[in-house]
Amino acid sequence: VKWAWDHMIQALSLQWQFDISNNSWGAIDPFSDNFNSTSLTFGWVALRKGVEDGRDGLGTSFVFSAGNSAGSGDNTNYHNFQNAREVITVGAANADGTMAGFSTPGANVLVSTYGVGLITTDRHQPGLGTQPSSDYENNFTGTSAAAPLVSGIVAMMLEANPNLGYRDVQKILAYSTTHPDGQDWKENGASDWNLGGLQFNDKAGFGL
C-alpha cells in the first residue's frame, strides 16, 4: 500500500504543470488517506503547489471522483483528497438525472454529473479486455466516469476564459447546476453582493 501511495504522491507533485488534473481514484477505507500521516503529508503539499503555482498562479483545477461506497456507509468527509478545499469532488448520477445509489455523499461534494453506462474506449487492445470484439465499452460506470466529464467541462471553461482562477472554476460550476430529483436540499448562506445563497445536498453537491 505504501508503494502505491508513494507513486501516487509523486504523480500528484507534478500536476502543477497541467491546467487540469483528473483523479478517478480514491482510498476505500475511511481515514486511510489522512494528510496527517507521514506518508501522505506531501499529498496536501502537492495540491497546494498546484493551486498556487499551476497555470502561472491561476491554479491547477484538481477534479476528484467522490467514490462508489455509499452502500457501505462511506462519506467523502472521511477522505482528505476528496475533502480538500483545493479540489472539485464529483458525484455520479443516473441517465435519468437522479443520483446513483452508490455515489459517496459528503459535505464536500461540489457537483455531480452522469456516471452510469457511459460509452468510452476499451482499455485493452482488440481481442482482450471486457469487450474483446470491440474497441468500445458502453457501461463505464462510477464516480470515476463522472469526474472526467467535469474535467472536460473545466477545459471548455478555460478555453473560453483563460484568466479564470481555480476558485472561479469551482464557483462557476456550483452556480451552473440544476437540481436532480429525489434529493433533500439545504439552504447554503452566501456573502455575495446580493446575499443570495445556494441549495446543497450531500449526495449531489450543488447539483447536476
Regions of interest found by a model, annotated:
Residues 26-28, 67-71, 93-96, 117:
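Catalytic metal-binding/acid-base residues of hydrolase active sites
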Residues 1-42, 46-52, 91-94, 139, ...:
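Subtilisin-like peptidase catalytic core
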Residues 18-22, 59-60, 86-89, 101, ...:
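C-terminal subdomain of the subtilisin-like protease fold in secreted/lumenal serine endopeptidases
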Residues 35-61, 77-86:
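Catalytic-core regions built around general acid/base machinery
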Residues 6, 13, 29-41, 55, ...:
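Surface-exposed intrinsically disordered loops and tails
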Residues 79-159, 163, 202-208:
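Extracellular S/T/G-rich loop segment that most often corresponds to the catalytic His/Ser-adjacent loop
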Residues 14, 44, 48, 147, ...:
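Predominant activation on well-ordered alpha-helical scaffold segments within soluble catalytic domains
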